[in-house]
A protein has these predicted regions:
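Pyridoxal 5′-phosphate
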Residues: 1-429
Length: 429
């Protein structure tokens, strides 16, 4: 049953996308046959295993990767956790007598899946974390990553595109800085036992720490991911719910040469990296969604950029007509084609979300993964800090994220209704 009416406008695609109807049809045709555990050796188990293997091959092909570099998980968050925790656990297994902690570099605007796992490692005294501050446009400077690299740095995890403000991070430039650091380390032949304690580093096949991980959940629909090697990352996380493939499935690309350990025990599925019965129907949905995404990516991005820029222009014009100060959060140029994030000063963003919802327009105030927790957006806080501005607790931000179903008329309806809401509350301030 579709609970959306024809008049409803869904503009929360950064939180979750609608499932592509073509994918629904394809899965419905065979879903009744996919009930069996893919680990079973009977014919129904083998049928599920075949679909699982074909899905893995399809994902690998669409990333220009090897099939044994693709691992399925239950969500994007789990994929991120496997990458981060698995890297640290593997380090401790290989260096049980180390006198120093492994070092991780990330940013202060990462998704909570990255930040909370890093905090967990800090709390357990299993890793040392450096949080790189973004600039006033919400961009992480690769030179800041370079400055933070140390002899005990084992992992750099920087998102490809921000889930709240949509800013695109210079992943290829960051990868370049890490490669330069590795070459320097190899040329100098660092003696970690003397310089840093009891850490032993192995330079096998020129692949060694630090490894580069990126959270690409928001990027897959729009940015370059078709050739992992050219992107320059060692690990990449994404999920199905952001690419019109349905909920409950995540994926981790891990380069063959990168060693990580499982974060939990079990039946040893996914080459012992993620135990648990695979959601084969969901994994099939993810593989089909990625294939569709890669085919229409350029055309759809160009279409949405026009709508996005129109929306930004019209929303900022409300500053004049409404009397409220309205600003765009994050870079206008280096942002996702579907992302608009504004702050309306003097009125609660939560109130605006509720009022717009009452009018059939669905937006959000921040990441859906953070909305259940207390406190304001750490991303907007980081942005205000970089801008040397005071964070306005009462205003927050309004995240408007477009999708394949979005048309220009939807923006006109949004702007009209938002204008009416602002007029309604003007006299309350």
């Amino acid at each position: 049953m579709n609970i959306l009416s024809k008049k409803d406008i869904y503009l929360d695609n950064a939180a979750c996308t609608m499932v592509d109807l073509n994918i629904v049809k394809k899965i419905n045709k065979i879903e009744k046959k996919l009930f069996a555990n893919a680990s079973g050796i009977h014919k129904m188990g083998l049928y599920s295993l075949n679909v699982l293997n074909e899905s893995r091959i399809s994902v690998a092909r669409n990333l220009n990767a090897h099939k044994d570099e693709i691992f399925f998980a239950g969500s994007g968050t789990e994929s991120v956790a496997i990458a981060i925790l698995g890297t640290v656990y593997n380090f401790h297994e290989k260096n049980p007598n180390s006198k120093i902690l492994p070092h991780i570099i990330t940013s202060n605007i990462e998704h909570s899946a990255v930040i909370e796992n890093c905090r967990l490692l800090e709390k357990r005294k299993q890793a040392e974390i450096t949080y790189i501050a973004c600039d006033e446009n919400g961009i992480v400077n690769p030179k800041d990553i370079k400055k933070a690299l140390k002899e005990n740095t084992i992992l750099v995890s920087i998102m490809y595109a921000n889930n709240e403000i949509g800013t695109i991070q210079p992943i290829q430039e960051i990868a370049k800085e890490i490669r330069h650091f590795k070459r320097f380390a190899q040329d100098k032949k660092f003696d970690f036992e003397k310089s840093s304690g009891q850490v032993t580093r192995h330079f096998q096949n020129q692949i060694f720490y630090p490894v580069l991980h990126t959270d690409a959940c928001q990027a897959m629909n729009y940015l370059f991911t078709e050739n992992i090697e050219k992107l320059g990352v060692d690990m990449l996380s994404f999920n199905s719910s952001k690419i019109y493939g349905g909920n409950g499935v995540g994926c981790l690309y891990k380069k063959r040469s990168v060693e990580i350990s499982p974060v939990c025990g079990g039946g040893g599925q996914e080459n012992n990296l993620r135990s648990g019965t695979e959601n084969v129907a969901g994994i099939l949905g993810l593989s089909l969604a990625l294939e569709i995404t890669n085919k229409i990516k350029d055309k759809e991005s160009a279409r949405l950029i026009k709508i996005r820029d129109y929306a930004i222009e019209e929303l900022l014009l409300l500053s004049v007509s409404s009397g409220y100060e309205i600003i765009l959060n994050g870079s206008k140029e280096n942002r996702l084609p579907n992302n608009i994030n504004i702050s309306v000063f003097g009125i609660s963003s939560e109130l605006l979300v509720i009022e717009l919802d009452a009018k059939g327009i669905m937006v959000s105030e921040r990441s859906a993964c953070a909305s259940n927790g207390e406190g304001s957006s750490h991303v907007i806080r980081a942005l205000r800090s970089a801008q040397n501005k005071t964070f306005d607790e009462t205003s927050g931000a309004l995240r408007i994220t477009l999708g394949r179903q979005t048309i220009k008329k939807d923006i006109d309806t949004l702007v009209k209704n938002l204008s009416q809401i602002l007029e309604k509350y003007k006299n309350f301030n």
